[in-house]
Amino acid sequence: MPKSEITIKIVETLLSVNENDWDACAASEAIDGKRPVDPFTTYRFLRTLEDSGSVGKSSGWYPYYILAFRENKLLGCAPMYIKTHSQGEYIFDHAWANAYERARGKYYPKIQVAVPFTPVPGKRLLAKKENQEQAFPILMEGIKNFASKNNLSSAHITFCSFDEFKKGESLGFLKRTNSQFHWKNDNYKNFQDFLNALSSRKRKNIKKEREKARNFGGKIVRYSGNEITGKHWDAFWDFYQDTGRRKWGQPYLTRSFFDIAGKNMSNELLLVLAEIDGNPIAGALNFIGMDALYGRYWGCTENYSNLHFEICYYQAIEYAIENRLSRVEAGAQGDHKLARGYLPSHTYSLHWINDSGFSKAVAQYLDEERRAVGREMEILSDYGPFKDLNLEERK
């Protein structure tokens, strides 16, 4: 069908989009009440960001969702934002911004096609399977055209899928790779079965860490669904604020985000808390996908030895084994995850630069960076915790 029969529309709120139409592109399984493969591109997650004021207003993330229609039916869509800074992205372009502004002018505003504050790989150009081949180039061209028409410096599609990454170069986007750490479930029967796959030294270290973590004077409890109460969210908000202040200067998400997510996404939430006499003193919030657990936020008001490792990493592994999930994605960065069974995995992004001269300079930088990332992953493979150190087989 010719492109002329497909129209692009930009909307500034998901109130302008039907939930089932969006999820038919992003996560059709969610329409049927199942857990989505990717909970973060669903209508309800993106709408929670919007309704809670975590995006929009003075956040520096301004929604401009891009929609492709064919005969008034939604063919494809993408979570697109105009950004006035580079915070909350986890794919860093601050050096590009500084160089661009020294040489050519304003780097901001720019376009970001991403899930805000969420370094989780997945599809960014969303469409039903039968429409993906047609929707992908239409949306990509729509993103570039919107940037050009509005004289924006650049467009960035971050934490995209490998398939999108492969196709993006032919449409004028530069390719960028990075890495983060994922745990893979090799059909383990229980946590001990996982430990048995590790080298003796790593196995002993994990056992010691778990023993020390349990000596904080309380108990560790998992909550999900309707078990998560307002009291739990109050406590977790304190944890999240502490982490936000230390890492970013201020939290990215608002307090109401957690209340709305708890109401609208309860089936996809796992809250792990450390409690003393029933009072939470530390915790981690995870999102549950159809086949993966996503560790997202951690914080504490009291710091105990190894409690972070227990709550964020080992509890997540146990939960994944018990619920037969194939992997745990523990978020951005953190070489310390390697010794705890999380192996490096490639992440991908695509970048379009409006200025051709600057685009060539960035392309050269990215070529060098990809080689450096490849070397780093090779080195990390030599320090893997498993008896069999073949990283490629474990990935």
For each of these PLM feature ranges, what is it?
Residues 1-395:
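N-acyltransferase acceptor-side catalytic subdomain
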